[in-house]
Every structure is written in C-alpha cells, then in structure tokens.
C-alpha cells in the first residue's frame, strides 16, 4: 500500500512538472482530465503512456519508472499544424487513448486512437463557427499509430511525411511498440 501511494505521488509530481514546464501549453481542464486519466490507467497491467512530438518527430513511451523508449516517427502532411477536417492530411493534436490493436493488411501493426473524441469535436465545432473550415466539412477519423510498409522504413529515416494524418513508425519499431502497448494507453500528440 505504501509503495502504491509513493508511485501515485511520483506520477502526479512528474505530470505536474511536465505540464508546468511545457511553455507551449497552459494547464487547462482538458490537460487536468488527461493527468487524471493517466493516473487511472497506469497500473501494473498498463504502466505506459505515450507522448508524440510533431516538432521533434518522436514518439516517446513512459512507464512507472519514467522514460522507457523513443521511436522516430512521421506524420500526415508537411503542414504540422493541428488537424482541422477530414482530408487535410494533418495529424491531430490533443489527448487520446489507444482503443483497438489490430493487424492492418497494408502495414500490419496498428494502434487505433479515439480520434475524434469530445475535445476534437469541440475544436472542430469552434473552427467551423469561426469560418476557418467550410460548413459542410467533416471531422474525419481513423487516426492511428502504425507501421510503414516493410520496404518503406526509409520514409522515417528521411522524415518523409506520407500518411493521411496518422503517426507512422518504422515497421520493425512498430512491431516492438505493438508488442507491449495495451488498449487504453493514454497518448498525447503535441506540436
């Protein structure tokens, strides 16, 4: 019981420090809810969470001990702004979770995210109301963390963004990630 209390305290401290020193973000209700979600989901069965940096082209995995692994990755288009609507080929930013692990016929290893979620819909509706996107635009979906095709790992080596908005890892590294990341793992995608 004492160890569990210490672990939860350390997780809380780490999350608070991470979000307070991240100058590009201000703590808000969505981030606070995400921290709470991380604490709820990080158990012995699922100690992981993922932070994806579009700026650094990195997917970082953390566990109860802190940093666990880093994988280079690529995204949708070279336009690294937040996803606005279906078809823009941008990778969405925000807090998500892995909802399905599946084998895709094109690249095998795929971790489907819960995009669009409530926060995604709020941003989408606001942008639509502000006239930033057409009234008939759709939000899109099917965003995942997945592998390249086996013969196309070079796309990651050369930071060649190629997906329709997903996050893509080298085939071999996606296989590694897929082997230990469970459904329910929290994922943050940031600029």
Show which residues each predicted segment covers.
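Bacterial N-terminal signal peptides
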Residues: 9-17
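Short Gly/aromatic-enriched secondary-structure transition segments
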Residues: 66-78
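Bacterial N-terminal signal peptides that target proteins for export
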Residues: 1-9
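Exported/periplasmic cell-wall-interacting domains
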Residues: 92, 100-191
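Well-ordered beta-strand positions in beta-sheet-rich domains
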Residues: 49, 70-72, 95, 142, ...
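Bacterial Sec-dependent signal peptides at the C-terminal "C-region" and cleavage site
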Residues: 17-29
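N-terminal post-signal-peptidase region of extra-cytosolic proteins
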Residues: 32-49, 54-55, 75-99, 126-131, ...
